[in-house]
Amino acid sequence: HANGSLTLGENIADHGGLLVAHQAYLNSLKGKETPAPIDGFTNEQRFFLGYATLWGQNIRPEEIRRRTKIDPHSLGKWRVNAALRNIAPFYAAFDIKEGDPMFMAPADRVVIW
């Protein structure tokens, strides 16, 4: 189990960093044509897929246990899923609706800034 007290600061940083990065990405597109989909994914979907790819991990159970005890960062899976589930643009990009595995009710989503 994750230690929320240990990872709280980094979880907040991941959330804020993702919001800022997404806004910077949108700002970079202003005045430009919308890029064509690649492999069936829109530019905004590719932004979120890139974020998810950044934190991909393949680690052994004993390393998971070790990191959970000492690392102030959540494991990659949770850095991705927890951050994405809390921001509205992710829902819009992938048309996520109630009943989908990544859905979280708007009232339950973290809003810090």
Task: Identify the role of each PLM range.
Residues H1-W113:
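Zinc-dependent metallohydrolase catalytic domains
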